[in-house]
């Protein structure tokens, strides 16, 4: 994650030119969160997807919708993730709407979900704020597909999960 300053809006294509430590990058419309409004001079956090070499020099590919942005925000906010005590197993994101993040710890004494949410929800609240109010569900990861599926579908009450076919990853809930 890097901080970028909005330099110029492109109303024709919907993209945004930003400055990152003296270098320019272009945030494509497809990499912006629906509903977010940017103005020149805004400082925004972006995820660096990659850097490629072009005829005109290096090109920085950035995103506000990539699940990696959420992962890095959690690493910044939750020391247990940064230190490796808690592992982010998977992230499913519908940018601007909802994110589900599955977390796990080898140490049974660590409440991975509770640590990510933080006292009185303060840790996850900071991430929600950075993502413009996007809802975030932190769920406990399990190696048992039935348990993990039930947790991932929260807040819905799941009565039963039946694995129909391991190969095609199909189940009945």
Model-derived regions, located:
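RNA-contacting regions in translation and RNA-metabolism proteins
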Residues: 1-173
